């Protein structure tokens, strides 16, 4: 118990990061191969996709790679797929909640579709959530799937929540193009949670 989703998340993250590198090298065909691979979990992971998973990040970068290859119409279909999903920001507790990152990619896809107001609404929603909850005192008095992991590692729930809220603030600012504010928020996240892999990847991407 407590390890659900972690191997699958690392599998997808590794493929998406490799695809982003290929995009930066103008190897768009290779990027697409990697991203299409990320859409399907191999059997040896022993885990299927959660119901409702939208793969916003994968579809967004498929759109970017496809557009760079000159097929704007096909790219628009990927951006449409990347733009769907809930825009409600979840807390940091449960692996089956939609990750906040997916709202960032929804917004970026909205931009690509010419729907800037809808994209901005998602980015501001991320920032508002983070600012409203960053000082929350968090305690758990019930059992859930994520609870065993949290207990084994003796997690400080309030500290973990604070790190998550700064991360969410960073996501919103990154989407809006407020790079310094995003960098500041991501650094605050990492000062509280050095193992926040997604935050580190986004921050490293900003510094390239």
Regions found by a protein language model. Name each.
Residues 1, 36-47, 81-91, 127-128, ...:
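Amphipathic alpha-helical segments of tetratricopeptide repeats
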Residues 1-8, 42-52, 88-95, 152-157:
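Flexible helix-coil transition and linker loops at the boundaries of alpha-helical arrays
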Residues 4, 11, 45, 55, ...:
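Residue-level recognition of tetratricopeptide repeat
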Residues 7, 14, 48, 58, ...:
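TPR alpha-solenoid repeat register
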Residues 10, 17, 54, 60-61, ...:
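"A position-specific structural signal for the A-helix of alpha-solenoid helical repeats
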């Amino acid at each position: 118990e407590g390890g659900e989703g972690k191997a699958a998340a690392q599998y997808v993250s590794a493929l998406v990061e490799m695809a982003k590198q290929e995009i930066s090298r103008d190897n768009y065909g290779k990027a697409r191969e990697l991203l299409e691979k990320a859409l399907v979990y191999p059997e040896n992971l022993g885990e299927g996709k959660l119901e409702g998973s939208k793969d916003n990040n994968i579809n967004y970068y498929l759109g970017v790679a496809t557009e760079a290859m000159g097929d704007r119409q096909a790219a628009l279909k990927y951006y449409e797929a990347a733009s769907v999903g809930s825009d409600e920001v979840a807390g940091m507790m449960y692996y089956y909640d939609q990750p906040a990152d997916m709202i960032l990619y929804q917004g970026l896809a909205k931009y690509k579709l010419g729907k800037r107001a809808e994209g901005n609404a998602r980015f501001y929603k991320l920032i508002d959530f983070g600012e409203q909850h960053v000082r929350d005192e968090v305690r758990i008095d019930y059992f859930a799937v994520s609870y065993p992991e949290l207990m084994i590692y003796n997690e400080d729930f309030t500290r973990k929540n604070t790190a998550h809220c700064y991360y969410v603030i960073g996501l919103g600012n990154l989407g809006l193009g407020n790079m310094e504010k995003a960098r500041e928020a991501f650094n605050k996240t990492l000062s509280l949670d050095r193992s926040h892999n997604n935050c580190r990847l986004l921050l490293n991407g900003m510094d390239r």
